[in-house]
From Swiss-Prot:
It is a multi-pass membrane protein. This is Phospho-N-acetylmuramoyl-pentapeptide-transferase. HAMAP family: MraY. The chain crosses the membrane at residues 22-42, 74-94, 95-115, 133-153, 168-188, 201-221, 240-260, 267-287, 292-312, 342-362. It comes from Francisella tularensis subsp. tularensis (strain WY96-3418). It is found in: Cell inner membrane.
Amino acid sequence: MLIYLFEWLSHYFKGLEVFSNYISVRIIMISITSLLITLALGRPMISWLQKMQIGQIVRDDGPQSHFSKRNTPTMGGVLILSSVIISCLLWGDLTSIYLWILILVVIFFGAIGFFDDYLKLVLKHPKGLRAKYKFALQSIFSIVLAIVLFYLLSKNGQMSLSIPFSKSLYIPMGIVIFVVLAFFIINGSSNAVNLTDGLDGLAIVPVVLVAAGLGIYAYIETNSTLANYLLFNYLGNPGLAEVAVFCAAVCGSGLAFLWFNSHPAEVFMGDVGSLTLGAVLGVIAVMVRQELIFFIMGLLFVVEALSVMLQVGSYKLRNGKRIFRMAPIHHHFELKGWPETKVVIRFWIISLILFLIGLAAIKVR
């Protein structure tokens, strides 16, 4: 919205055209805007959640240190999502269909997560939205979205799977493989981030790092000069560059949310935040054709999800025997005696290393 205002004002005031003509400037401005919105609305929202008694439910069989988290305000993810949408409407190019798709993903998965949280925290339904209904909604949306993305991206022939650390190795994909891969990436990422969000600040930092990494790839691949210089396939789809702007909004809002979510957490994002942010990252990875880079940068999420799958499989197939003391795996380390802050910071370090490996693939090819 603001880019049109600055474009008009630039006819009367020299220099204002940088806010409408340069995506790099808008990336900076949207990250600052989303950060300030989240910081400004954070305290009032926490107070409102406390007043409405929308608080965290803690498992009785979990680490004893978690008992103090009981009734901590939850559903703070609404704050992140609202900030991202408002910032995108202000600084995004509203003619970009890719920007609107990402906003739609935020709204749809946010609605699923919100309803799940509402059932658990407000109506006191012990399990919230049933897993089969949640999975069905996610699946239908992901499949439809994957088909839409296939036809949008295929207009410029960008239907190959990019192989990291390779200059010219790409795997072509037809619609079936593309849709299946996109389905698993979007749904898997959504649920993996949701499983990771179990300790103060644990999930939001990896989310910010992965969003930043994918944003960098989006900026490079939609800039013909940078793409040619770094030997990337140039993604010339009109409006696709707005993916980088969207990523910046996620980073700004996520960092501001960490202000309130760091130990001891004043608010948790809830399913409304974690399910949505995970889905958004998956969609972005598909849009910029960097699914394998996303796997590298988001490997922490993969490990968290695999730990749950292995735990459940072991319990069912080995007569109740478990691999971990508790799953997801961050709880396993807590029950081994690691303080929560040590688990979180070490997982952050791992996520940072994975982020740097993913960035290294830009040049080491």
